[in-house]
Amino acid sequence: MTNYFESPFKGKLLTEQVKNPNIKVGRYSYYSGYYHGHSFDDCARYLLPDRDDVDQLIIGSFCSIGSGAAFIMAGNQGHRYDWVSSFPFFYMNEEPAFAKSVDAFQRAGDTVIGSDVWIGSEAMIMPGIKIGHGAVIGSRALVAKDVEPYTIVGGNPAKSIRKRFSEEEISMLLDMAWWDWPLEQIKEAMPFLCSSGIASLYRRWQGTSA
């Protein structure tokens, strides 16, 4: 099978890959999938991608997504563990014995990934999860609960390891929301973005936005 990626050292922007209308992506977010060989569309695990009522995968800007990351979509995918059987009879209703089966599909709500989020290789995000801006998801983490902004999580199930910055610094970053700035403003702020000088960037931003 031909590898969708030419090199393990360079990802591709999601805007260049995504064809599924249920996946919404921001600017400059990328997927580096060389070691798994497929485009980002295959990272979103939909049961029926053309259904009108499926949950959406919404990804912000400037996100970094490692090879083999998976987003489990389409709600419960037709399995009801509160019924006698979790088997999805409805999706095999061409079988006469299953003709009276009921569609067990339930939405979980949209999966929303904030901006400037780093998702490690082979991490798995469960349905309906919300991941805050600036979060870091460790490789092979199984994320079954929402993740707060600028929080590093890892493990199975994923648990909080630590915050990236102090609460005051996180408040500054969320207030600035640099990922929404025009490119020219980002260009001018690049020396600050590539440093740990959050307070300095915040003071500069306050001066330009006054």
UniProtKB/Swiss-Prot annotation:
Disulfide bonds: none annotated. It comes from Escherichia coli. This enzyme is an effector of chloramphenicol resistance in bacteria. PROSITE patterns: HEXAPEP_TRANSFERASES (PS00101). It is an enzyme of class 2 (transferase). The active site is at 79. GO terms for molecular function: chloramphenicol O-acetyltransferase activity. One of its GO terms (biological process) is response to antibiotic. NCBIfam families: chloram_CatB (NF000490). Keywords: Acyltransferase, Antibiotic resistance, Plasmid, Repeat, Transferase, Transposable element. Pfam families: Hexapep (PF00132). It comes from the Bacteria. InterPro entries: Hexapep (IPR001451), Hexapep_transf_CS (IPR018357), Trans_hexapeptide_repeat (IPR050179), Trimer_LpxA-like_sf (IPR011004). Gene3D superfamilies: Hexapeptide repeat proteins. Belongs to the transferase hexapeptide repeat family. It catalyses: chloramphenicol + acetyl-CoA = chloramphenicol 3-acetate + CoA. The keyword Acyltransferase applies. This is Chloramphenicol acetyltransferase. Its EC number is 2.3.1.28.
